[in-house]
């Protein structure tokens, strides 16, 4: 009888160990995919359960939160990421996961409309990141802090953090994020009424986007340059640039109509500008 009980216990331990190894292996696989193939990472995580040790459950919760964010699924319930924090807050040596947990918790709070709560978490991460060499994650953090200040119309603080984001992305050699941060800097500068500086920054973003063939970011740069030339009214827009802006504007989207309003104003075609302005306000067309 005793032998049977012992054998049963050994079998349970064996199969539990196999399950745990399988769970860890799948979590490793999801983590490896999460940057470049977040949809695949999310599929793996959806097939797993939040089981195992406290460390495995916390890792699962953090990875799942990250995968949702990277797949543009806008979660507003923080119960999952709180579960990760309940574990990682007691493990200061795992600073990287501590920072990531607070970062994604901040994003959930921001989506739920709790901007002060999000900012408190972001500033806590900023303090912790001083002890690490993680320029990419620092860049993501500074971009989010900049967004909070931008939404509060504190454009000088927003510009400061967008610039920090750009510098960190540059250090991380991530040119796509560097281009986005440069566009954010330009937007903050534009809203601070420094048109000359905004023009330089939008032009710099366009150069980066052209160099690395980031078509959507190039289009965003062109659209904003058109608006900037219209608003400033000081400089004559180069003909080649104006032609390129016009060619980049789709004629079936709201952003495209907005760009074509600016293009026709710059060409002094008032009737055409009015035509696209009417389309802009009456069309059900989607955004770009």
Residue spans for each PLM region:
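Conserved small/polar residues in nucleotide/adenosyl-binding loops
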Residues: 281-288
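N-terminal leader/linker segments that initiate helical-solenoid repeat arrays
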Residues: 18-66, 70, 74-78, 96-97
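Amphipathic alpha-helical segments of tetratricopeptide repeats
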Residues: 46-50, 84-90, 124-128, 163-168, ...
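Conserved alpha-helical positions within TPR/SEL1-like repeat arrays
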Residues: 62, 69, 100-111, 136-151, ...
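Alpha-helical repeat scaffolds
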Residues: 44-45, 76-84, 235-245, 273-279
């Amino acid at each position: 009888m005793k032998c049977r009980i012992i054998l049963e216990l050994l079998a349970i331990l064996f199969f539990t160990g196999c399950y745990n190894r399988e769970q860890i292996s799948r979590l490793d696989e999801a983590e490896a995919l999460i940057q470049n193939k977040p949809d695949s990472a999310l599929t793996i995580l959806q097939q797993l359960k939040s089981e195992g040790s406290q460390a495995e459950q916390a890792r699962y919760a953090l990875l799942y939160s990250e995968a949702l964010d990277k797949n543009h699924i806008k979660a507003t319930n923080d119960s999952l990421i709180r579960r990760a924090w309940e574990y990682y807050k007691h493990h200061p040596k795992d600073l990287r996961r501590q920072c990531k947990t607070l970062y994604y918790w901040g994003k959930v709070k921001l989506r739920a409309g709790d901007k002060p709560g999000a900012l408190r978490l972001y500033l806590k991460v900023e303090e912790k990141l001083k002890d690490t060499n993680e320029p990419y994650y620092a860049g993501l953090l500074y971009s989010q802090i900049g967004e909070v200040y931008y939404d509060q119309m504190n454009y000088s603080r927003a510009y400061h953090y967008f610039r920090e984001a750009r510098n960190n992305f540059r250090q991380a050699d991530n040119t796509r994020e560097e281009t986005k941060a440069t566009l954010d800097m330009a937007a903050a500068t534009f809203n601070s009424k420094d048109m000359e500086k905004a023009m330089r920054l939008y032009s710099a973003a366009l150069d980066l986007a052209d160099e690395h063939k980031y078509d959507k970011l190039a289009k965003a740069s062109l659209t904003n340059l058109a608006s900037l030339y219209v608003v400033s009214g000081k400089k004559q827009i180069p003909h080649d640039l104006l032609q390129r802006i016009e060619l980049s504007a789709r004629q079936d989207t709201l952003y495209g109509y907005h760009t074509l309003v600016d293009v026709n104003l710059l060409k002094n075609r008032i009737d055409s500008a009015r035509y696209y302005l009417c389309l802009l306000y009456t069309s059900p067309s989607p955004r770009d």
